[in-house]
Swiss-Prot record:
Organism name: Rickettsia felis (strain ATCC VR-1525 / URRWXCal2) (Rickettsia azadi)
Keywords carried by this UniProt record: Cell inner membrane, Cell membrane, Membrane, NAD, Quinone, Translocase, Transmembrane, Transmembrane helix, Transport, Ubiquinone
Example of a GO MF term: NADH:ubiquinone reductase (non-electrogenic) activity
Subunit structure as annotated in this protein's UniProt entry: NDH-1 is composed of 14 different subunits. Subunits NuoA, H, J, K, L, M, N constitute the membrane sector of the complex.
Lineage: Bacteria, Pseudomonadati, Pseudomonadota, Alphaproteobacteria, Rickettsiales
Catalytic activity from the UniProt record: a quinone + NADH + 5 H(+)(in) = a quinol + NAD(+) + 4 H(+)(out)
Record-given protein name: NADH-quinone oxidoreductase subunit N
GO biological process: ATP synthesis coupled electron transport
Origin: domain of life: Bacteria
Length: 458
């Protein structure tokens, strides 16, 4: 039971917080501050009960799992701080349901990360999915938000059905739902077990959907555009990191070097994601839609590391998604500080000439964009270099060249953001009050992007 303590603790924090938010009205900000502090303490709790290495009833624990969960929880706390300060900035009542949904979503991610059984993994991912649909449609009076959430729900439900169908194939042809049993079947079967492969591919469709990779990416631009910007920070950072860790677990524990799945399927998805993400963003005017295509592109890069199936490849994939998540949070936080209520409608027009009166925000956004391009000595360069270097070492030249090519294409729209801020005609923007939570997040982002490569190299 102690192994489940991080999950139980977060669930209790979410439910008790919601309970007190209902019975003590008009105190949501105070309650949210207490919840954020409790979540910070939960990070240490997650470390404490991850010292035991092993598997208990399909639920694994260990140091690496504890670190993974702590990283996801840290980015979740940042998303909660962003929502809290955003509600203050736009003078809107803080809806505690947002924090409850995010925490329950993280519980699902925690379960998925520790799962060593397909059915348990499915349950964890579904808890994350159901709460994500609600987060996407959190702006109740906004048509675009409702439209995006409905698309997300319909497509997500379809993919969940495919995933469950895949589990039935896995059990039927593999005789078990345990990861180690399926790995044994794949490695010791004299012929190709087509039914088992179909089952695994169908199950993987759910993970690729949540990662926003091609061809299960169609929901991403509409959902990002319609969702509240605080929800988008969660989707881009904590949620994506969690799903990448789940995919890495499956790659290490099941797929391995099994050629038909690992090489053919994931390689094609990686290439298509890079190409579609790079070229799809070129004509976008909405900054949230641009970041949606950027997410698709960067998930393609992450899949390169997954495909390599070695420790260095996995490290490169995890490091890259962390760098991208930090940059994305910095970008969205700057939009909130700059535009306030209009951050959800951010476009190239809304940031024209802001460098004249908002030098600090323009500088932070520029650093984020340069890091995403991969300009040295920023951390984004280190992440891309490490990823492509590992691909070339494994003689995956097509993936490396495709990654470099799409990085050059993506530089066009990243630099377009910088151009709009520094070289376009100035528009008047109402100066908003500085909030210390958002300011601290941005300084941490800049520090990581500027100095992260030096820290990581040691």
């Amino acid at each position: 039971m102690l192994l489940l303590l991080p999950e139980i603790t977060l669930t209790l924090i979410a439910l008790l917080g919601q309970f007190f938010a209902v019975i003590i009205p008009n105190k949501n900000r105070i309650i949210s501050n207490i919840i954020i502090l409790l979540c910070i303490l939960s990070i240490f709790l997650t470390f404490k009960y991850s010292s035991y290495e092993g598997v208990w009833y399909s639920f694994a624990t260990g140091i690496n799992i504890g670190i993974s969960k702590s990283i996801v929880l840290l980015f979740t706390i940042i998303s909660m701080i962003i929502y809290r300060d955003y509600s203050i900035l736009i003078a809107e009542e803080l809806k505690f349901e947002f924090i409850t949904l995010i925490l329950l979503s993280v519980v699902g991610i925690f379960v998925a990360i520790s799962s060593r059984n397909f059915l348990l993994l499915f349950c964890g991912m579904e808890l994350t999915a159901l709460t994500s649909y609600a987060l996407a449609g959190f702006k109740l009076n906004d048509i675009k938000s409702s439209e995006g959430a409905l698309k997300y729900f319909i497509l997500g439900s379809l993919v969940s059905c495919l995933s469950l169908f895949g589990i039935s194939f896995i059990y039927g042809f593999g005789g078990s739902l345990q990861f180690e049993d399926i790995l044994y079947k794949l490695n010791n079967n004299s012929g190709m077990n087509l039914g088992l492969i179909i089952g695994i591919v169908l199950f993987l469709s759910s993970i690729f959907f949540k990662l926003s990779s091609v061809p299960l990416h169609f929901w991403v631009p509409d959902v990002y555009e319609g969702s509240p910007i605080s929800s988008v920070t969660y989707f881009t950072a904590a949620s994506k990191i969690g799903m990448v860790i789940v995919l890495l677990n499956i790659s290490k524990l099941i797929i391995g070097n099994y050629y038909p799945i690992n090489y053919n399927l994931i390689k094609i998805i990686a290439i298509l994601s890079m190409l579609f993400g790079a070229f799809g963003a070129i004509r976008q005017t909405s900054l949230k839609r641009l970041m949606a295509y950027s997410t698709i592109l960067n998930i393609g890069y992450v899949l390169i590391g997954v495909l390599l199936h070695n420790q260095e490849g996995y490290k490169a994939a995890l490091l890259y998604i962390l760098i991208y998540a930090v940059g994305s949070i910095g970008f969205f936080t700057c939009l909130i500080m700059l535009l306030g209520k209009d951050a959800d409608k951010a476009s190239f027009k809304t940031i024209q000439g802001i460098a004249e009166n908002h030098k600090t925000i323009a500088a932070i956004i520029s650093i984020v964009m340069f890091s995403m391009i991969g300009i040295p000595p920023l951390t984004g360069f280190f992440g891309k270099y490490y990823l492509f270097y590992q691909a070339i070492n494994q003689e995956e030249f097509i993936l490396a060249y495709c990654g470099i090519f799409t990085s050059v294409v993506a530089a066009f729209y990243y630099l377009k953001v910088v151009k709009a801020m520094y070289f376009s005609k100035k528009i008047e923007i109402i100066k908003l009050p500085m909030l210390y939570g958002l300011l601290l997040i941005n300084y941490l982002v800049v520090g990581f992007l500027l100095l992260g490569s030096f820290i990581i190299s040691f």
